[in-house]
Amino acid sequence: MDDHAADLLAAVAEVARAAEAADGAAPLDEATWLALRHHPERVRSWVRAGGFALVIGADLSLVVHPQARGRGLGAGLLSSALAGLSAGMPLEAWSHGDHPAAAALARSHGFERARELWVMRRQMASALPQLRAPDGVTVRAFRADSGDAEEVLRVNAAAFAHHPEQGSMDATNLAERMAEPWFDPDGLLLATSAAADGGEQVLGFHWTKVHPGDAGAGAGPGVEVGEVYVVGIDPAAQGRGLGKVLTLAGLHHLAGRGVPEVLLYVESDNRPAIAVYAGLGFTHADDDTHVQYRR
């Protein structure tokens, strides 16, 4: 990482930490942090005292320090970013929390509300149902010294073929995530069955995550929070209840880690998934919603 990239990362981190402390939600997603750390050449940036705007591909991020809000800095950063991009370039921007100020800024610059992502949470003090896998299915942890990584990528690509963020994960993206401090191979659970050639095939996976106590996951400082990070099922194996089985297996793993709360993200219109998660004890608060705007 050269000096410019390091300075950008430091400036972004300082403002993001302050915004997270004030708002109770991290203002940048994991993909943005990974790009800043590993692929700074992909990041276009507009940095001012008290705030910044970033564009990575078609994704726009804009964050203003709490002490610099209400002075037009956000509008100025957004105008500068839009002026520096190709006319008519499609853009997507997330508001991590349904903030009225973000909605007003988006509307004033031609962005429309496009998606809502719910945060659902489960308090782990309540007992979990017993785990029962279907006949012929084994749930086990990821093994780094096997072909598991390739199988996870295969299932992920099939399961999220129509999902713009998750479906594009490749071997490099996977390796970057596995190099993160939070990665635990025991928390990446695979549902497998016997293959026709006598080997083993992966039917689906549940990748769990534990946020450190300072990660702003909403449980208070110093408190670790678990996450249902990704659940992916091979379309050829759907209809067997594997999504619920893998989700429950991950919850048992996170319970063993001692986290008091587990969160997950789900599209607000994915009623079947919401019903499954509600049946496992997850709830959603109206203000625990992330909103995507498009232009």
From Swiss-Prot:
Binding of acetyl-CoA 2, residues: V231, G232, I233, Q238, G239, R240, G241, L242, G243, K244
Single Gene Ontology BP annotation: mycothiol biosynthetic process
Keywords carried by this UniProt record: Acyltransferase, Repeat, Transferase
Subunit composition and interactions: Monomer.
Record field: catalytic activity: 1D-myo-inositol 2-(L-cysteinylamino)-2-deoxy-alpha-D-glucopyranoside + acetyl-CoA = mycothiol + CoA + H(+)
HAMAP family membership: MshD
Positions contributing to acetyl-CoA 1 binding: L62, V63, V64
Domain of life of the source: Bacteria
Sites where the protein binds 1D-myo-inositol 2-(L-cysteinylamino)-2-deoxy-alpha-D-glucopyranoside: E30, E165, K209, E227, Y265
Cited NCBIfam families: mycothiol_MshD
Name the record gives this protein: Mycothiol acetyltransferase
Protein family according to the UniProt entry: Belongs to the acetyltransferase family. MshD subfamily.
Function, in words: Catalyzes the transfer of acetyl from acetyl-CoA to desacetylmycothiol (Cys-GlcN-Ins) to form mycothiol.
Species for this entry: Nocardioides sp. (strain ATCC BAA-499 / JS614)
InterPro entries per record: Acyl_CoA_acyltransferase, GNAT_dom, MshD_Acetyltransferase, Mycothiol_AcTrfase
EC number per UniProt: 2.3.1.189
Single annotated GO MF: mycothiol synthase activity
Span of domain N-acetyltransferase: 137-295
Transmembrane residue ranges: none
